[in-house]
């Protein structure tokens, strides 16, 4: 070909029969007659066949395996979500042939079922998988980039929180709650440390260090048999440090006297091997006379604490955000904040918040006024 003698292997006998070899020879002659190099054509066909074998599922599994920093449980959840929602529709498709409209089909199906948060996560993961394909040299362009805005976002749920001038009323109702003592202490502690519900109800005694006055909520907890979601630790899946005020330590000491021999801090009403119900705090607030949808709910304590700390003007935004355990969008800034921790300031801040609540037991005072009084 091209004035040069070339050899073309037709296959080994007996794997390739004589009849097949003759057919391949004849095909090669046809290619030569059309000005096509049979050996180069053979290579091109082989490359094409290899590319056809690179499916969305193959790439998705490689992307999944590359995320080695994920916890085992999170990794398993991500893979199951891909298997349940994406692979059946586009898993066997050649990664290079997928268009934006193809990627949207399974995501829109999930959206149509009303699972908007799941659809949003699938959109993010599909984009990441296709980006991985670009970075791996499998495709030149990421068609998932065009999905942005095509999937409805879940309506942000409003968490009811009291106006700060109603804090004295809330404290009075907590102090006079006549239900289960452990429930009253749970509500009071949740207000003092303003952590999330699952972070509180799945808490273990092993996480609390009374000597250093520190509660370390792990990124993931050991699962409790028969208890759904009991592996949940901090929402950000990294250890969250909660400095304990004198008031918080006193509450934990009281609880320790009740069930310090148990693994869980907040044991269930009927079975001490299981945690209190996820509805315990909100149910107690309803017993106190509050509408947990319009007035205040357990999660609303976080809003009240955050508003008070900012209004006081005493604390840096970084310290407040770190204690709230909010996700920092900038990875560079997140790394800085995580490393710095602001622990010294946060210790003072949590003690100030506890003292501020005590001051409101005597008379109503705003965070700003209380901070001015403390400075005098």
Regions found by a protein language model. Name each.
Residues 70, 110-125, 135-203, 210-211, ...:
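Basic, Lys/Arg- and aromatic-enriched nucleic-acid-binding interface segment
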Residues 153, 161, 217-225, 249, ...:
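Catalytic-site neighborhood detector that most strongly recognizes the C-terminal catalytic loop/helix
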Residues 141, 207-214, 294-295, 314-337, ...:
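Short, polar N-cap/turn motifs at the start of nucleic acid-interacting alpha helices
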Residues 145-152, 202-254, 328-331:
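Conserved tyrosine-mediated DNA breakage-rejoining catalytic core shared by Y-recombinases
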Residues 30-43, 97-101, 131-154, 218, ...:
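Short, charged hinge/linker segments at domain and secondary-structure junctions
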Residues 1-8, 33-40, 50-113, 129-132, ...:
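Basic/aromatic-enriched alpha-helical hairpins
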Residues 168, 172-184, 193, 242, ...:
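Short, basic (Lys/Arg/His-rich) helix/loop patches that form interaction surfaces
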Residues 50-57, 93-101, 138-142, 153-172, ...:
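DNA breakage-rejoining catalytic core of tyrosine-based enzymes
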């Amino acid at each position: 070909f091209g004035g040069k003698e070339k050899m073309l292997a037709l296959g080994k006998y007996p794997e390739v029969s004589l009849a097949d070899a003759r057919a391949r020879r004849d095909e090669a002659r046809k290619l030569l007659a059309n000005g096509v190099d049979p050996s180069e054509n053979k290579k091109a066909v082989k490359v094409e066949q290899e590319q056809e074998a690179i499916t969305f599922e193959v790439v998705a599994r490689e992307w999944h395996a590359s995320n080695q920093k994920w916890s085992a449980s999170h990794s398993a959840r991500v893979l199951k979500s891909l298997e349940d929602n994406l692979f059946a529709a586009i898993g066997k498709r050649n990664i290079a042939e997928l268009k934006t409209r193809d990627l949207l089909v399974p995501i829109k199906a999930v959206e149509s079922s009303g699972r908007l948060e799941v659809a949003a996560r699938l959109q993010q993961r599909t984009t990441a998988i296709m980006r991985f394909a670009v970075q791996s040299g499998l495709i030149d362009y990421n068609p998932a980039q065009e999905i942005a805005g095509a999937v409805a976002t879940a309506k942000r749920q409003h968490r009811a929180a009291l106006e700060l001038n109603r804090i004295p009323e809330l404290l009075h109702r907590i102090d006079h709650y006549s239900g289960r003592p452990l429930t009253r202490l749970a509500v009071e502690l949740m207000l003092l440390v303003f952590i999330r519900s699952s972070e509180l109800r799945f808490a273990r005694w092993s996480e609390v260090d009374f000597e250093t006055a520190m509660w370390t909520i792990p990124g993931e907890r050991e699962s409790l048999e028969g208890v759904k979601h009991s592996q949940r630790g901090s929402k950000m899946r990294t250890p969250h440090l909660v400095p304990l005020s004198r008031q918080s330590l006193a509450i934990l000491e009281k609880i320790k006297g009740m069930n310090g021999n148990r693994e869980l801090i907040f044991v269930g009403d009927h079975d001490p091997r299981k945690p209190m119900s996820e509805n315990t705090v909100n149910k107690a607030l309803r017993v106190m006379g509050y509408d947990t949808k319009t007035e205040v709910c357990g999660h609303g304590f976080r809003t009240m604490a955050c508003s008070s700390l900012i209004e006081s003007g005493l604390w840096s935004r970084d310290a407040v955000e770190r204690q709230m355990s909010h996700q920092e969008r900038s990875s560079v800034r997140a790394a800085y904040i995580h490393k710095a921790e602001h622990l010294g300031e946060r210790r003072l801040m949590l003690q100030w918040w506890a003292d501020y609540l005590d001051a409101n037991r005597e008379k109503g005072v705003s965070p700003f006024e209380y901070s001015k009084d403390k400075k005098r």
